[in-house]
């Protein structure tokens, strides 16, 4: 059973997400209306996945994200955002968010997204704007993606594409018929060679480089 906490002060968004997730098999969901309540719920109920609004009235969602990430054995956190919150995405990802979902996400896509997060995958809304991707990566190495990709082996490029598709290490291992340990080694090498600090950053790099359209070859 996947335990999910939805944190949003807007009742319409919070209850809507809760209803969608509660109707899915294998998911239990609770809600919180503030950052303080979110932290208390995480400490008391130990959810597996937290969907956290970036902006809330009492405590900034990015601050709550940092507080959650500092807890022992923290849950996976994905940020809830809207198009006008683009400027917060970079900070959220650098602070350890496992991705972000737009608040108008297709209801049918929400349970699979939560399941992917629970397995250790990443979630990047298909409606992510080019501005977000380019703006986030502009703070990274100042070189063209094609140049950075030259440092990757063919196998590492394949793994990078699957990371960008949101697959966890276990999912990638099954898809590529490799051991999980081998996949972990590939992921570590990819992060080092691309000079990014996490899977979501690597996924955004792959998006900017066009790997999701052209494939890994």
Task: Report residues per predicted region.
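Short, flexible helix-to-coil linker/hinge segments that flank and couple to helix-turn-helix
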Residues: 88-94, 104-154, 158, 208-212
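Active-site residues of response regulator receiver
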Residues: 53, 81
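Short hydrophobic/Thr-rich beta-strand motif most characteristic of the beta2 strand and flanking loop
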Residues: 26-34, 41, 196
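Receiver (REC) domain active-site loop signature in two-component systems and cognate sites
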Residues: 56
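Recognition helix of helix-turn-helix DNA-binding domains
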Residues: 166-201, 205
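Acidic catalytic/metal-coordinating carboxylates
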Residues: 34-37, 60-63
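Helix-turn-helix DNA-binding segment
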Residues: 144-182
